[in-house]
Structure formats: C-alpha cells, structure tokens
Amino acid sequence: MRPPQCLLHTPSLASPLLLLLLWLLGGGVGAEGREDAELLVTVRGGRLRGIRLKTPGGPVSAFLGIPFAEPPMGPRRFLPPEPKQPWSGVVDATTFQSVCYQYVDTLYPGFEGTEMWNPNRELSEDCLYLNVWTPYPRPTSPTPVLVWIYGGGFYSGASSLDVYDGRFLVQAERTVLVSMNYRVGAFGFLALPGSREAPGNVGLLDQRLALQWVQENVAAFGGDPTSVTLFGESAGAASVGMHLLSPPSRGLFHRAVLQSGAPNGPWATVGMGEARRRATQLAHLVGCPPGGTGGNDTELVACLRTRPAQVLVNHEWHVLPQESVFRFSFVPVVDGDFLSDTPEALINAGDFHGLQVLVGVVKDEGSYFLVYGAPGFSKDNESLISRAEFLAGVRVGVPQVSDLAAEAVVLHYTDWLHPEDPARLREALSDVVGDHNVVCPVAQLAGRLAAQGARVYAYVFEHRASTLSWPLWMGVPHGYEIEFIFGIPLDPSRNYTAEEKIFAQRLMRYWANFARTGDPNEPRDPKAPQWPPYTAGAQQYVSLDLRPLEVRRGLRAQACAFWNRFLPKLLSATDTLDEAERQWKAEFHRWSSYMVHWKNQFDHYSKQDRCSDL
C-alpha cells in the first residue's frame, strides 16, 4: 500500500484521472454519496440527478429539465404529446432545458419590464420538460404539492423564467413545487377541428400529461400525490380553469388557484369555425394550400410541418380578425372533447361541491396591455390621451361588438363631469380593458363556483413593487403579484425593501396554507386578521398589500354588473334586432323581386291583350 501513499504526495503525478481513481479507491463514493443521496431520484422513466440551490433560509433540492414527453417535432408537430420513453443511465437535471418556440417581445429592447417575460433559454420544439423543487433534506412524510402553469396569452411563456424560481417558496413553506413547459402559439393551439393531424388544444394536453407525471412520480421527491394544488396566472389561470372543467383533468389535482385569469374570459377560447379560419389563414400566409373538411387537412398539416418553426411564429399575429389588444392568435378551442361546451356553459352546469378555489386580480389589470396597441399609449410618456383616442381605444379594447355595444361601453366608463380629461380617459380605458378581460370574468367565475358548492377565497393585489420599471401611471400591472407569491424579494441580490420581504413571506404563507388545507388563513394564529370566504351573496374579498388584511365587498360590482349582466342582454337584443332586420330585408327583397316579376308578366300580358283586340 506504500506506492499509492507516495503517489499522493507527488504533485507531478496527480493528474485529474489519477485523483478521481484515488478518490474512488479511498472511499469518496461513500462520503459523497451521503450528500448526493438527496440529489438522486428514481422516477418511472429512470434516474435523475438534481442540484442543491442556496437560499437565505437554507438549501433546497432542484431537479430541472426533466423530460416528460417525447419531443413534439417533425411528424409530431400539432399532435397530442406522447409520454417520454424510459431512459438508461442518469439524466442530468441540474439546469433548465429549452423554451418552447414562441414570439419574442421586441417592442422595448433591453427594458426590464418586457425582458423579464422573454425566453431565457434557447427556443426549440424539443421543449416538454418540467421542474421539481423540494426541501433539502427531502421530506420524510408526504408533503403538499403546488403545480405552476405560466401565463403568456397562450403565445409565450416559459417555466425557466427567473420570476418563477421555486426555491424561495419551497424553502420557506416546505412544500414541493412543480412547473412545466407547454407548447404555445400555433404549435400548441392551431386547430383544424375534426382532423386527427391538428386536433387543437395540444398545449392543454401537454399540461395534463405533466399532471399525470406528477401523480405517478411526485412521491419520489417527498410530495403527496393526494394533495396537489394547481395554480397559474393569466393564460395559466385560464388553463387551470379549463382543467377544472375537463373531467379527465379534474381527478389529477385537488385545489385550484387562478391569478388574473379565468377560462370564461373573452380572449381565452375560440369556436371551431374561427379556429379553422385562423389555421387556414396561417397556412395561406406561409404558402401552404388551403384545407377543407376532409382529406385536404392532411395535406395542409403536412405542408405546415415542413415550414421552419420561426416562419410560423413570424406570421402568427396576422391571423387575428381585427386590430385589438388582449386578443391572441392561437388559443384553446371549444372542440367537444377537452372542452365539451363553452366555458360559460360548463361553469353554469357544473357541480363544484367540495372544490376549494382561490381567485384574484391585481389593481390595474388593463394598463399593461394598453402600451401594446391602444392609440396614444406608450411606456415612455404619461399617455394622456384625447377623447378621440379613447373612443378608438374602446374599439380595439372591446373588438367584435356592435357599434351600439361599443357606445354602451363609452357611456358607462366616461366621467361625464370631465369627459375630455386626458388622465381620466387614460384610467377609464385601462379599466375597460382590465374589467372586460380579467376582473369581471374572474368575479363571474367566483360567484358561480361559490353558488354551486365550492369554497372560494378572493383577493385584489394592490402593492406596487418598489423595483417596478413600468411608469407610475400603470399602477399595479397585470402579472406583478407573481414575484411576491414566489418569494423573489427574499433573493439578496435584489433591491426590495424590508417591508416587501415580510409581505412576500405573508403571501407565500397564504398560498401554502391554501395548498395544505384549502384555507389561506393561518391555523396557528386565530388572532390574525381573517380572510373570509367569497360567497355569491356577501362577495367578500381581501386587499393584499403591505398593510394587514382588509376585508371588502363587491369585486368592482358596478362594472361587473355591466359586463356580466347588462352587456350580454344588450348584445342578445341587438342580435335579435339584427336578425329581424336581416329577415325583413330578405323578405322585402323577395317581395320586391316578386313584384318586379309580376309587373313584367303583367306588362307582357297587357301587350298580348291589346294585340288580340286589333
């Protein structure tokens, strides 16, 4: 045994290979194995090696970039996902994998407010990976699981974004957190209903497959598959709602959190006819032949599969039927399968007894979208708009309604004591877009779920982060509660205030309490301010900001009565009038044609009579 000891003291012979050999012979496996045991996990597909991450409160284990589906590339483009086949060896799960192909926002290059939502990994169609964060050391008893679905209008988003870093929430609350990538844009939601080659909703099916993976594998990470809470924001929240409404998904989770989005939002779904129109329009734009209702669909999809991914992305926005804000090209389709009916119909007909749901919005849901196309708006000025710009903004903020309906919106949102005031018009258009697309669909969903047996909690998030880069006039924009839910202020490299760190800890506790019990309140402190359930009658919700909980009633009740009650009746009445007018005009046209024909016949007959008399 002398030679190895001598060699160990001979620097010239201490090559990396030799040191590795000596480490193996000297018991390094046992010593390192005790540390690595937390980072080695076996799931149904094979073995994974994770990474230990630091937080101010201690370490967590992270398993990043776990494959859960076969790459949806080539002939698999537009098709439902296929589970990942088992692998040999150990998959390196120490870093995030590629982001699904998508549109990249270049409106404000280098601006933190937009760059934070842009992909932070390379784009690829090989993107169906998920991530798991778990306490270090791993829980010895089953731990509640939170599963995150990102937003992004169904056209963008990635689970690898810094704002979705799960380490702080997991360390603070000792939960297990899972997030997944899913296909977006045409790759996830292009639909030719009735076609097996592009059935639509495959992005939702990606999410469902990840939920099935959680049921099969999360116990290996210390998670409890019988206590899974699905949570998401914006399009992620709409996705959560669609899983609530789709029976094959419903059994894969047990509680739901919908942040700033709902499946009944006017932007969240399209019908089969519009889905087909958009798909064939995209095909036309990229030089593929039009499809029909039969075999031509196969040819159209085959052609679309030959087009480079970036080419499809470049043309996606051109399929929208008109200029608009808060409308997206490829979204879930009411296909009779994943969604057996419209979300509104499914919500109204559903049985939600025993369901536990947390829903909410931020203070200024509409402001973010105005700088993406509303007349007169920009992040670089105060956006003090004119009356004419407000009127034009209503038409892009509420597309596809009649002139009478648009006039009703203008009437409701105008401050008639100051109808020309630019600041009031700016705030009014922000409210139009936010109420129409987020606040009132969420309020409608909360009321219906509560009326049908669900236990619902509701909030309005009202704190503007001290680090926010968007201008002050935008208030608390869409998406800017997320950093607090994930505990990002606890990152010592960031410049949040001490009060914001405490606030983030409060919010993480509310979300974790809900994941554990279905109730966000602190069970160990009955003297703490209580968050009451939201009921269809009382409509109680809480304000979330740096102050203690404040209970309020009626989530923008007047505005939502307009959107959820009055406007649908107006649209229905005008649709009836329009149909009556169409029928009257058609009958008048037929009568006029008949009279012209009768007159011609009569004239011909009269001439014949006169000739016979001669």
Swiss-Prot record:
Molecular function GO labels: acetylcholine binding; acetylcholinesterase activity; amyloid-beta binding; cholinesterase activity; collagen binding; hydrolase activity; laminin binding; protein homodimerization activity
GO annotation terms (biological process): acetylcholine catabolic process; acetylcholine catabolic process in synaptic cleft; acetylcholine receptor signaling pathway; amyloid precursor protein metabolic process; cell adhesion; negative regulation of synaptic transmission, cholinergic; nervous system development; osteoblast development
Compartment(s) of residence: Synapse; Secreted; Cell membrane
Expressed in which tissues: Isoform H is highly expressed in erythrocytes.
Domain of life: Eukaryota
Binding-site residues for huperzine A, renumbered to this chain: 117, 164, 368
Annotated catalytic residues: 234 (acyl-ester intermediate), 365 (charge relay system), 478 (charge relay system)
Variant or mutagenesis effect after changing residue 478 to A: Loss of activity
Major subcellular site: other
Group of enzyme by EC: hydrolase
Known EC number: 3.1.1.7
Disulfide bond residue pairs: 100-127, 288-303, 440-560
Keyword entries, A-Z: Blood group antigen, Cell membrane, Disulfide bond, Glycoprotein, GPI-anchor, Hydrolase, Lipoprotein, Membrane, Neurotransmitter degradation, Nucleus, Secreted, Serine esterase, Signal, Synapse
Residue positions with a glycan: 296, 381, 495
Gene Ontology CC terms, in alphabetical order: basement membrane; cell surface; extracellular region; extracellular space; Golgi apparatus; membrane; neuromuscular junction; nucleus
Residues at which galanthamine binds: 117, 233-234, 368
Residues annotated for huprine W binding in this entry: 153, 234, 470, 478
Membrane topology designation: Peripheral membrane protein
Signal sequence segment: 1-31
Coiled-coil regions, chain positions: none
Catalytic activity: acetylcholine + H2O = choline + acetate + H(+)
Family affiliation: Belongs to the type-B carboxylesterase/lipase family.
Function: Hydrolyzes rapidly the acetylcholine neurotransmitter released into the synaptic cleft allowing to terminate the signal transduction at the neuromuscular junction. Role in neuronal apoptosis.
Assembly, per entry: Interacts with PRIMA1. The interaction with PRIMA1 is required to anchor it to the basal lamina of cells and organize into tetramers. Isoform H generates GPI-anchored dimers; disulfide linked. Isoform T generates multiple structures, ranging from monomers and dimers to collagen-tailed and hydrophobic-tailed forms, in which catalytic tetramers are associated with anchoring proteins that attach them to the basal lamina or to cell membranes.
UniProt protein name: Acetylcholinesterase
Organism: Homo sapiens (Human)
Gene from which the chain derives: ACHE
